[in-house]
Amino acid sequence: MSLLTILLDGTAAAGGAIGAGFAAMGAGIGIGQIGKGAVEGIARQPEATNDIRANMILAAALVEGAALFAIIVGFLAMVL
């Protein structure tokens, strides 16, 4: 193997790991913001607790799904 091939393989692995890490951090921040908004909404309007909670869970699931795809792509970049 030439030095260039080794460097390119290492760079691809590092890029995949960094991308997966940023995806996980972004999902954590996004879900935190969703939870913050839900708690503020429930504090303002306690009678709408069930509706707010259902929407919060749906939004958090969508964020987690997008983050999961990003993490898988990052891991594939490391492997391939």
Where do the PLM segments sit?
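Hydrophobic, small-residue-rich transmembrane alpha-helices and their short perimembrane loops
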Residues: 1-80
